[in-house]
């Protein structure tokens, strides 16, 4: 996609079901995106280095977030719907503004050692993971990547 300098939410067509790899990579003007309900996969590099992207609403049908999907963005938080089963390598690499991740799956999605990587360790120093109280122990493998795990979400 061509670079856009719009400083507002990017409205995707509700009929959209598939994003291509690198679909919005380097679109520096996008600040917020709401993915339509038909989108189940956020592909590799889909929003990588969209340096002003601070907010994303994932489809309630999202199952997979692939490698580097949100790397280098300005995301401050993200809510993973209950349907998410996996997050790839470096999904949130160098997302230095990320302070909160809400994860609604009752079974922790599969992640890699680099899903929440940051060159300076900022994510671990400042970011909290919020999960359902009944799912807290399912996220034991995630604890090393966050400042704290808070079990206080309510079912969506």
Report each predicted region and the residues it spans:
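Short, aromatic/basic amphipathic alpha-helical patches
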Residues: 114-120, 137-151
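Consensus positions within tandem repeat domains that build extended binding/scaffold surfaces
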Residues: 20-23, 43-46, 66-69, 88-93, ...
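Structural signature of tandem-repeat unit edges
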Residues: 1-18, 28-41, 51-64, 73-86, ...
């Amino acid at each position: 996609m061509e670079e856009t300098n719009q400083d507002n939410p990017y409205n995707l067509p509700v009929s959209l079901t598939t994003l291509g790899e690198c679909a919005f990579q380097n679109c520096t003007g996008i600040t917020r995106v709401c993915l339509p309900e038909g989108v189940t996969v956020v592909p590799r590099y889909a929003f990588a280095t969209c340096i002003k992207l601070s907010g994303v609403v994932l489809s309630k049908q999202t199952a997979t977030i692939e490698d580097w999907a949100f790397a280098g963005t300005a995301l401050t938080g993200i809510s993973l719907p209950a349907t998410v089963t996996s997050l790839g390598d470096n999904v949130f690499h160098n997302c230095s503004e990320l302070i909160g991740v809400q994860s609604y799956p009752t079974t922790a999605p599969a992640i890699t050692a680099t899903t929440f990587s940051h060159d300076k360790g900022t994510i671990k120093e400042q970011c909290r993971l919020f999960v359902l109280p009944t799912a807290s122990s399912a996220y034991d493998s995630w604890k090393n990547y966050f400042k704290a795990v808070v079990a206080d979400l309510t079912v969506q």
